[in-house]
Amino acid sequence: MNTRSNRRRIAVLGIALAAVLPLAACAGGGAEPDTGSSEGGAGAGGTDPDTFTVMTANENPVLEEQLTALSEGACKAENEALPLEHQKVAQADTVQKVTLLASQGALPTHTIAGTALIRPDGDLNAAGLVGDLKAALEGAGTWGNVLPAAASTVEQVYGGMFSMPYQYNIEGIFYNKEILADNGIEEPQTWDDLVDAADTLADAGVVPMTEAGANGWPLTRIMGMYIFRNVGPDAMAAVRDGDAKLTDPEYVAGAQALADFADAGYFGEGFSTRDGDTSSNMFLTGQAAMTYDGSWLLSAINDPERNEIGGENVGFMPFPEVDGGKGSIDQYAANAGAPMIINAEQFGPKVVDWVSCIAENYGQQALQDAGVISGFKVNGDVTDISENTAEIQERIAGIDETVLWFEALMDSKSNSLASTNVTLLTTGQMSAEDYMAQLQASIDANG
Amino acid sequence: MNSIFGDRKTIFILLAPALVLYTLLKVVPVGWSLGLSFFEGNSLRGFEWVGLQNFTTFFTDPAALQSMWVSVFFAIVATICQVALGYGLALLYVFVLRKGSTLVRTFVFFPTVLPTVAVALLFRSFVAVGENQGPVNDIINFFGGESVEVLASTVGTMTTAIAMTLWSSMGFYAVLLYAGLLDIPEEIIESARLDGANGFKLVRHIVVPLSLPILLSSIIFSLNATLKVFDSLLALNGGGPGTSTAPMTLYMYRTAFEYAEYGYGSTIAVILTALCLVFTLAIFRSSRRKAEV
């Protein structure tokens, strides 16, 4: 009897102790910054690390290859002063890994991060770990290498120049010139023209527009672009600031337009479970006439093994206007790739040199080697650009004003909800009003 | 022998390594998680005491309640079907196939060793539409029907998930219950047969009561395993369409690791554990009542 109650007492004590442990963690929790300001606006004010550790996503091998190429070529001197070292992370695990590393004080020098984390009110920035690239590059005199359009997009999305624009993508509708010509369709200038064109194409037995519904965001892009064309380029900023609500009629019209488009079957059969590669292939093998996608598709378009319809047959047009809307057709949707930040605590002079060297040379390196359009100036000659790439580059050079994407300014929970619920919206299981109401409720609760 | 097991110090020294490892890896994290459920935040932002607020949030959070419903529904339906099917197969092995059951047993058991993610992807392509249409829709088309986009509806996804779980685990329960059925003495079956009990009557009045202990263990085991389902539903359709097939485990994972809210994630874990306990105790209680009667 005695031993049993003793044992029970020990067990209870053990569990109570374990339950109290988090209090100790709480006391020491939160990275206290001792260098750099808490807004990340101190720019280069950190101490150099021993190696230039770079963490990139598994899904993006190009960035790793190009940085390695730079370290052996144009940036050899900087590499000798501070050697490059690569780390990888699966893109879906980014938030988890970065939060963990940051809380242990082991955040790499240059790393991919989550959008919400690096904003001024995000966990990383509030802990003083996000370096200000504009201040650092201006200080080194190399700020001119960042394209103004890219800088503007990065500042719009992240609330400051916190990310290196290794990619600069514009979005629009890629179309099969031959199929459209065969059906007597010209580039649609308005949404109604687009719907009519889709109708004609559907009758001709071709999938009018293919989208990867399994990922969610390709569908919300279309809804978002409708809203930007209908309400104007500040549509989503107004929602973030509370000046407008997603349940306002002009916004619901976007959800309704998407639902109607899907309901008419213009995305093809089984679109809600279609993955990205399948969708791109449907376009590149001529089964679909159009696809709304971004200029990252160029790598597939320029690949003769994947592109069966031929590069000269691929046209690009901006998302059409909406009748009576305040947006205009030349406001392209642009994004600057996944956020790649510099750890403010390690932003010493050697790191600034490395970053400056990247800013000077990455534009030309990536375009020449991998056909990737970045947000950096191309300083030098590039040979053998495909016509499609050249066309996109020309459009980017002529851009005045860009818009972001639908979820760009949302918190991570609402971002997730927008993608998961769009399947229900486009398969008729949720009405446009309900979709917007739920999303607005989430933004109000979490934003 | 007795002098070794009689000496408490020796017992402690022999047990200590495994016990320490077990405590550190299992008991401490469970206690830590229980403690975390009264806080809010993550390791980077720091933790803030919120008391029982996480628990009250859980019961007013529609996403959390939906995930709880998905977990419970999946657990109950999958358990009933799995154990019933497994029991039917076990009866088949014992009474119909007898000696020749080894080959059938092996084949039916085989899917159990396959990784659950692989099985989920397999079933996903079974019900696919469009480009690479799967056999299910091919059969429907053959009989003149139109292709059904199974994974675009909650009912379709849930049905596929349950079919998938049954296919991969009925062999396991069949073997488990088969072992239990073998324990029933031949003489009892013989004498029952002599008394005129045959087929269904034999099963209902003799076999089931005698195999009740193993049946109840299987049900408890199955409930606990299916309440914690994660990879099958995630790999099949990402918890979709929307979040209508996202169980509590998936919601907990997303909360803790995608939204970086460790406190609320721990709360969900605690509630899931409590749910498993409730189900287990309920089965125990009902079995004890049966034995007393």
List PLM regions with ranges:
Chain A
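Extracytoplasmic/periplasmic solute-binding protein
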Residues: 158-166, 171, 195-244
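Hinge/lid segment of periplasmic solute-binding proteins
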Residues: 116-171, 222
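A local structural motif
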Residues: 77-89, 107, 183-186, 260-273, ...
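Extracytoplasmic/periplasmic substrate-recognition and gating elements
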Residues: 264, 305-370
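Short helix-initiation/N-cap motifs at beta->coil->alpha
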Residues: 88-97, 189-196, 270-284
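Glycine-centered hinge/linker elements that transmit conformational signals in sensory
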Residues: 240-271
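C-terminal capping/gating helix-and-loop segments adjacent to ligand/active sites or protein-protein/ligand interfaces
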Residues: 239-240, 371-380, 390-444
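Conserved N-terminal structural module of periplasmic/extracytoplasmic solute-binding proteins
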Residues: 2-13, 26-122, 139-140, 366, ...
